[in-house]
Amino acid sequence: MEKLARKSVQKLTPYLSARRIGGTGDVWLNANESPFDNEYRTNFARLNRYSDCQPKALIAAYAAYAGVKPEQTLTSRGADEGIELLIRAFCETNEDAILYCPPTYGMYSVSAETIGVERKTVPLTEDWQLDLSGIEANLDKVKLVFVCSPNNPTGNLVKREDIIALLEMTKDRAIVVMDEAYIDFCPEASTVDLLAQYSNLAILRTLSKAFALAGLRCGFTLANEELINVLLKVIAPYPVPVPVAEIATQALSEAGLARAKFQVLDLNANRAYLQVGLSMIAGLEVFEGWGNYLLVKFPNGDELFKAAWESGIILRNSPIKDCVRISVGSRDECEKTLGFIRNYYS
């Protein structure tokens, strides 16, 4: 049957998510998930009816949390669907292109390739910042520029002045898509305030990380109302199941927000603990991280990754030579991981 698939799909290499890669163990620090398993009321009614395309209570709650108007907010099945919607809505197949800056999140490329949209890359600089001159030289045919901050997998923040320069550079030419999946761990670095000034800005958000709802698959796109209305033309008629909308709305309640804030503080403290501990091991380079993960360069990254895997500590290998990404888990998980790495290099 594969021969019946589109040629581009036949050639496609699927994104290898943490779950696809698999593994067995009791310490899972490979998918940037939260260690907190929060409880929600699940006495759902109305499951015999379709959900609203954009549930009003959920949209209102997230808009209030993000500091935007409900008309500037769209919810979808994770931020991944937001990526796909933007490409489908704004890029002509075999005509337009997207641009992204590796090393970064892999789904920008996969979504574009699946739809038949050209992918242009301008690698990040040595300190993992935007190469603005390189981007400007490659903007021909580009409709969307994806920027992840905090960047996955490197963990760093993209300089605000560079984001503004990029928005100015792409005015009336392309949309800058800021992937803020991890911004809840450093909300002061958000670009949401720039929406009022730049109509060519779209922001991706998720409840998977700081809100501990990776299994719920609930994301958001923030943008000006005109852009949101374009996305509403291509989104599925019932993208958010009733249970998803109700649990997400609970997570965004006053009590839910207070809990998320406390858990973010806890995870940021665990990140600092892990960063200091790893930095004290000779031969390791620990990069500053602003999300719920750290990128670490080892003398022999692939060997360390494999040894940890075989010991039941599941980390995430990286396209960056000898680098491994470590999610920030519970204090117990961080202690076990740190202890294993110390012993490995002792």
From Swiss-Prot:
It is an enzyme of class 2 (transferase). Its EC number is 2.6.1.9. Keywords: Amino-acid biosynthesis, Aminotransferase, Histidine biosynthesis, Pyridoxal phosphate, Transferase. Gene3D superfamilies: Aspartate Aminotransferase, domain 1 (3.90.1150.10), Type I PLP-dependent aspartate aminotransferase-like (Major domain) (3.40.640.10). Pfam families: Aminotran_1_2. PROSITE patterns: AA_TRANSFER_CLASS_2. GO terms for biological process: L-histidine biosynthetic process. GO terms for molecular function: histidinol-phosphate transaminase activity; pyridoxal phosphate binding. It comes from the Bacteria. Pathway: Amino-acid biosynthesis; L-histidine biosynthesis; L-histidine from 5-phospho-alpha-D-ribose 1-diphosphate: step 7/9. The keyword Amino-acid biosynthesis applies. It catalyses: L-histidinol phosphate + 2-oxoglutarate = 3-(imidazol-4-yl)-2-oxopropyl phosphate + L-glutamate. The modification N6-(pyridoxal phosphate)lysine is found at residue 209. Its cofactor is pyridoxal 5'-phosphate. Belongs to the class-II pyridoxal-phosphate-dependent aminotransferase family. Histidinol-phosphate aminotransferase subfamily. NCBIfam families: hisC. Homodimer. This is Histidinol-phosphate aminotransferase. It comes from Vibrio vulnificus (strain CMCP6).
